[in-house]
Each structure stands twice: as structure tokens, then as C-alpha cells.
A protein has these predicted regions:
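Glycine-rich phosphate-binding loops that contact phosphosugars or nucleotide phosphates
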Residues: 297-439, 443-446, 526-567, 590, ...
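Structural beta-sheet core signal
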Residues: 4, 99, 165, 176, ...
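Glycine-rich oxoanion-binding loops at beta->alpha junctions
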Residues: 72-85, 280-293, 317-353, 359, ...
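Conserved short alpha-helical segments that host acidic/polar catalytic motifs at enzyme active sites
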Residues: 1-251, 255, 267-301, 339, ...
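Active-site phosphate/pyrophosphate-binding segments
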Residues: 265-303, 393-522, 595-615
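Generic C-terminus detector
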Residues: 258, 549, 562-564, 574-615
């Protein structure tokens, strides 16, 4: 949700690094921003404002922004409205400490009440200020070091957090801690960097430590990184090399990250398949299925847990796995699964899908399933994130950093991995014929080229979008493998254009949504040449009979539906099971161009965050 950045060193001024880091984290979504710095005189200054990082920069133009140590933050409101007062960093009452925090302190009201009874005054409505006031109170009352005060305070806290803390009495130290919220320490030559993920760090160093739950990091100038737990037991941090370059997170000439990421999909899916699909022998090989063959082959049931777009990918995966592997598959919202005491056990495989690998509900669902003895398989994009570290095995989608808040290439990457998983497992189980297996593998390998050709419809869709910006509601229809694509298309439109949209199975239209159809409600119908073609064509005729306006997604060469639809987008002809990978592309572009026509911020839509690390 929020973005955390920190810097400590003598090579650079902290402020430019912090601001640049916040801009790299803008994709996560936020409503306010702030920075805390300790200057050479030992003064601790906090500057913060509602709005964008650019607003913070403007606010700081006449401020003292000197110093070689600092922390910075972008906030997405959870406790307290978006405002300068509620923005981070927060001072303690003594103004000796400043803190930034990502997460939710569940028992903050109780702690706040106790502190107020002791005379502590609060300036904001946030749970974060409660934490810094608690640390300051413990440090003063018990005469403890900052580290020990943090450890004692965190013992009292219930909830999730990633924090970074400055103490003006120790202008050479940053203390950071995490629990259920990501935090990465970058290690440079005599300097330290801190980030919610690696994107603010990689310009300066590729050596990082991903903090685990319960870790507290002490970054002190002139010393090695020290990592301890809440009991002050010293740990040995694993230093990893980040395989990401700066060019991967720049716009590359595109006006928006979202459009760039839509157009990256041919290359991304090629990368996703690299080393996994042997085109010469028409084989799919996933190391996870080799290493854990027995556990996966003997699964009685597969449960997919995910949120948002990843849940839609899971719906496609369900159909794929059931079709090829003949194993029952359930797809659950992780946020529901974790709280409803599900029936899950040792004979189950749970597949957890998350772009960021940090989705709080999905991570909690993983922990619940693990506690019941299930085998956990992760499908993530962010290497080294929490979910891959919590699972038994898994597969990275390898589509590179996704900066736009609305997921595009991560979705197609997830569907590609689920397709490869289904094919590899079916081949191992013997539940798919040789001909069907090889045909599907061959066709899957051609998908990147199909998408590359399909992206030529961008200008056509941009023109089409202008026709439909008037709409206040959209209906998306699909059947079979296309139904989850309809759901995903509707979600994309909602996310970035703020137009209400619903995805429905086309056959269910007559059970309610048909009552809404009139000349003011566009309907996007996925009507490709699959087994449901005639039925969807009938649905389109029902819509037209009620003056509905139809945008039809059809197979190239279709001459029937083009005669009755108001607008037509053609797809390359491919197998039914692979159709989601191509059908989703024009829906991504349609959502993008409608949002642009309406003047919306497509990369950072309101109220949304890229990585949902709180419940």
C-alpha cells in the first residue's frame, strides 16, 4: 500500500535519493507524501503534504533539506483521512523520533488511550503516531536504547507493520522492522538504502536483504548491517543480488506505464516461457513439478487462493487444470478463505497467486493452509517476496516490474504459468492425449507472436473508445474460458476509468442483467469461434433487440456478428483454452483509451494501491 524509502551514508545527500525513491514507488498508490531528515547540526525536520510527490517537492523548495540520513513515505489512508497532518513521517511528542509505517496496528485505540492517560498528546488520527509515541514513552520511561525500546513496543503491538525510525540523538542510525509487510535493505559501499521493494534501491546497489517477519534491522554508519529479532537474538541476513535494472522501471517512451506494460506482453510471455517450453520437442518442463512430482501427482484437490486480477487468472487456471488434469479445483478469494474455517488438509495442493508476493490476505491464506498440512504452490512475479518464501515450491511469472496499478502483463503471465502447470501435470498424470498435449504446447508457444500482431488494433480501439466515453455503465459477457476474461475486462474499466462495469456469464444475462440493457449501456461480448459461438450470437441479438450497443470481440474473418454489432475487434484464431491470453488484450486497451479520453490518471487511479499489504 504505502511506500517506504530510507537512506544513510556520506556519499550523497539524502533528500534527492528519497524523492527519487518515492517516485519509483508511486505505482503502489498513495494520497500524501512526506520526508524526515537529520541535518549536520543534528536537527530532525519533518515535511509532509497531501497530494503527490511533486507537491511535496514544491512544499520543500524553501525548507532545509540538507543531511545524509533520512526516511520518506507515501501514504494510502487506512486510519484518518488523507491530509498533511495524517501523512507520514510522524514525530514523537518529544520530537526526538520520527517514524514511517506501512500496515495496520489493530490495537492502536487501546494503546492510544493508555498513552493519553499518561499525558501524551496526539496530533493526528493515525495508528502510526501511536506507535512512535509508544516507542518514545518506553525509551524515556525505562531509559532504554532505541533498539530495545522498539523491541518492547513491538511486543505490545497487534497487527502488521513495516517501519523505519530516526532518532535525532543518533544521527548515524536507522532502525527498521517488519511483520507481514515487505521491507528491503540495500547495502552499498559505506551506505544503506531502504525500500518497500527493490525499485528505489536498484539505481545504487544490487545487493539487498529481504527482511523476514519479526526481523529488526539496525543500519549504522560505518558498521555492518545488524539484524535481530524481537527477543534481541542476532540473525544472519542473507544478502541477495537483485536481477533488475533501471530501464525496466522507466516508461521507455510510452505516455503511461500501463500502455508500456500492455505492449510489453509479447516479450514478457516469451520470457515467462523461456526454459520451460521446449519448442523443438513440444514439451513443457517446470522444475517445481520435477522436484515435487509425487506430492502434485497425488493431490486429491487443488485450491487456488488469490485476490483481484489474480483471482480472475485463477478462474482460468481452474478450467485449464480440470480440463487437462481431471482434478477438482476450487477458486477462493483469499480474503474469504482465511476467515471461514475452510476444509483443507494434507491431500490438497493450494496454489497462491499474487503479482507482488505481498498481498496480505493471500499470505494469510497460505499460512492457514500450511497449518492444516496442505502443500503450497506459489505463482508470483516479485522475486524474493513473502509468498515465495512461505510456499513449498512454485513458479515465477518473470514478466518484470509492473508499475501501473491496474495489472496487465502480470495477468497474462499468471495465465501462462497456470497453462504450463496444467499441461505439465496432465502429461505426468497421463490424463491428456499426446496429440492434444503437443498441439496445445505448439499453440501456446505462438501466443506472443499472436499478441504482437493483435496490438496493431491499438489505434482502432483508441478511436472506438471516444464513442463510448459517455457511458456510466458497461456489461461484459463471456462463456467458458471467456467468462473470466469478461470479469477481468470489467475490472480494468472500473479501476482506471471509474465507470461502473460488471462481468457476467453470457447465459446468465437473461437472469437479471438484461433488465438494465438500453441504448445507454454498452455491452462487450466475447463471441469467438468456440463451442459457445451460436449461443453468444443469440445473446447479442437479444441485446440489439433492446437497443443495446454491442462491442463484439470476434475471431478474425467473422462476417456474421460484424453485421449486427456496433463495433468489432478481431482476434487471431486459437484454441479455446488459450483464448484468454489474446482476448484480454483488446479489453486492456479499451479500458486504457476510455480512461485517457476521460482524462483519468491510468497509472495511479484513485483509492487503489498496487500492492495491497493490509487487510
Amino acid at each position: 500500500m504505502c511506500g517506504i524509502v530510507g537512506y544513510l551514508g556520506k556519499k550523497h545527500d539524502a533528500y534527492p535519493i528519497l524523492i527519487k525513491g518515492l517516485k519509483r514507488l508511486e505505482y503502489r498508490g498513495y494520497d500524501s507524501a512526506g520526508v524526515a531528515l537529520i541535518n549536520e547540526d543534528g536537527d530532525l525536520s519533518v515535511y509532509k503534504t497531501k497530494g503527490k510527490v511533486a507537491d511535496l517537492e514544491e512544499f520543500c523548495t524553501d525548507k532545509d533539506i540538507t543531511g545524509h540520513i533520512g526516511i520518506a513515505h507515501t501514504r494510502w489512508a487506512t486510519h484518518g483521512e488523507p491530509s498533511s497532518v495524517n501523512a507520514h513521517p510522524h514525530y514523537s511528542q518529544s520530537k526526538n523520533l520520527a517514524i514511517i509505517h506501512n500496515g495496520i496496528i489493530e490495537n492502536y485505540a487501546e494503546i492510544k488511550h493508555n498513552l493519553m492517560e499518561k499525558g501524551i498528546e496526539f496530533q493526528s488520527e493515525t495508528d502510526t503516531e501511536v506507535l512512535v509515541q509508544l516507542i518514545d514513552y518506553i525509551q524515556t520511561k525505562k531509559n532504554l536504547s532505541l533498539l530495545m525500546a522498539v523491541q518492547v513496543a513491538l511486543h505490545q503491538v497487534i497487527g502488521a507493520y513495516a517501519i523505519a525510525l530516526l532518532d535525532k540523538r543518533h544521527p548515524d542510525t536507522i532502525i527498521a522492522a517488519r511483520k507481514q509487510s515487505p521491507l528491503v535493505v540495500g547495502i552499498g559501499d559505506g551506505e544503506f538504502f531502504l525500500g518497500s521493494d527493490a525499485s528505489p534501491i536498484i539505481e545504487y546497489t544490487d545487493k539487498v536483504v529481504y527482511l523476514d517477519d519479526g526481523n529488526i534491522a539496525v543500519m549504522k554508519l560505518g558498521e555492518e548491517l545488524k539484524v535481530v529479532n524481537i527477543l534481541n537474538e542476532e540473525l544472519s541476513p542473507e544478502v541477495q543480488t537483485v536481477d533488475m535494472n533501471l530501464g525496466q522501471i522507466e516508461k521507455g517512451g510510452y505516455p503511461h506505464f500501463m500502455l508500456k506494460e500492455i505492449f510489453e506482453q509479447p516479450a514478457c510471455l516469451t520470457n515467462c516461457m523461456r526454459g520451460r517450453i521446449n519448442v523443438e520437442h513440444d514439451r513443457v518442463t517446470l522444475s517445481a513439478l520435477i522436484d515435487h512430482r509425487s506430492k502434485l501427482l497425488n493431490a486429491k484437490r487443488i485450491i487456488i487462493v488469490a485476490c483481484g486480477t489474480s483471482w480472475h487468472a485463477g478462474l482460468i487456471g481452474k478450467q485449464m487444470i480440470e480440463t487437462f488434469c481431471r482434478i477438482p479445483v476450487e477458486v477462493e478469494y483469499a480474503s474469504e478463505f482465511r476467515y471461514r474455517n475452510p476444509v483443507v488438509g494434507e491431500s490438497d495442493v493450494v496454489i497462491a497467486i499474487s503479482q507482488s508476493g505481498e498481498t496480505a490476505d493471500t499470505l494469510a491464506a497460505v499460512e492457514l493452509a500450511k497449518s492444516r498440512g496442505a502443500f503450497i504452490y506459489g505463482i508470483c512475479n516479485a522475486i524474493g517476496s513473502s509468498i515465495p518464501r512461505a510456499t513449498d515450491t512454485g513458479t515465477y511469472i518473470h514478466v518484470g516490474p509492473e508499475i501501473g496499478v491496474a495489472s496487465t502483463k502480470a495477468f497474462t503471465g499468471q495465465v501462462t504459468v497456470l497453462t504450463m502447470f496444467a499441461l505439465a501435470l496432465a502429461d505426468a498424470k497421463g490424463t491428456v492425449s499426446h496429440d492434444e498435449y503437443t498441439k496445445t504446447v505448439k499453440e501456446l508457444a505462438q501466443i506472443p507472436a499472436m499478441i504482437k500482431d493483435l496490438l496493431k488494433v491499438n489505434d482502432q480501439i483508441a478511436d472506438m473508445a471516444r464513442t463510448f466515453t459517455y457511458a456510466r455503465n458497461f456489461l461484459y459477457l463471456g462463456r467458458g474460458f471467456s467468462y473470466p476474461v469478461a470479469l477481468e475486462g470489467a475490472l480494468k474499466l472500473k479501476e482506471i476509468s471509474y465507470i461502473h462495469a460488471e462481468g457476467y456469464p453470457a447465459a446468465e444475462m437473461k437472469h437479471g442483467p438484461i433488465a438494465l440493457i438500453d441504448s445507454d449501456m454498452p455491452v462487450v461480448a466475447i463471441a469467438t469461434h468456440n463451442g459457445m459461438y451460436e449461443k453468444v450470437r443469440s445473446n447479442i441479438q437479444e441485446i440489439k433487440a433492446r437497443q443495446g450497443r454491442v462491442i463484439a470481440i470476434v475471431t478474425k474473418g467473422d462476417t456474421t456478428i460484424s453485421q449486427i454489432a456496433d463495433a468489432v475487434i478481431e482476434l487471431p484464431d486459437t484454441m479455446d483454452c488459450l483464448e484468454p491470453l489474446v482476448a484480454t488484450i483488446p479489453l486492456q486497451l479499451l479500458a486504457y483509451h476510455i480512461a485517457i479520453c476521460k482524462g483519468k490518471d491510468v497509472d495511479q487511479p484513485r483509492n487503489l494501491a498496487k500492492s495491497v499489504t493490509v487487510e
